[in-house]
């Protein structure tokens, strides 16, 4: 039986990194934390980002990031928490 990872090419890997890093920037958290959310808390990386590469990579960055964050929320990842903390930090700095 072929392992799913056998068909990951450099395009898919580069796209996965692009998604992880841009989600991290939007949520103001580390790429490592986002990777854990997409692989350990959910399986979004292997079940959505990689298999849907052909469609997703044609969209703009904001659409991709917001789409994945919305899916993370649907899967129970507490993304809103990171957004709230960032907003509170910004309020205190202004």
Locate each region found by the language model.
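Intrinsically disordered, low-complexity, basic-enriched segments
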Residues: 8-10, 21, 36-37, 50, ...
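Long, hydrophobic, amphipathic alpha-helical segments used as structural scaffolds
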Residues: 27, 31, 35-38, 76-79
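Methionine residue identity
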Residues: 84-87
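Long, compositionally biased
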Residues: 51-81
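N-terminal acidic leader/helix
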Residues: 2-33
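Amphipathic, hydrophobic secondary-structure cores in small proteins
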Residues: 32-56
């Amino acid at each position: 039986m072929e392992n799913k990872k056998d068909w990951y090419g450099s395009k898919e890997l580069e796209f996965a990194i692009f998604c992880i890093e841009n989600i991290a920037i939007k949520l103001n958290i580390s790429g490592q934390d986002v990777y854990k959310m997409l692989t350990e808390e959910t399986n979004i990386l292997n079940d959505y980002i990689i298999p849907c590469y052909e469609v997703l990579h044609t969209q703009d960055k904001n659409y991709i990031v917001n789409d994945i964050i919305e899916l993370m929320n649907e899967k129970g990842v507490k993304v809103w928490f990171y957004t709230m903390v960032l907003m509170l930090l910004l309020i205190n700095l202004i």
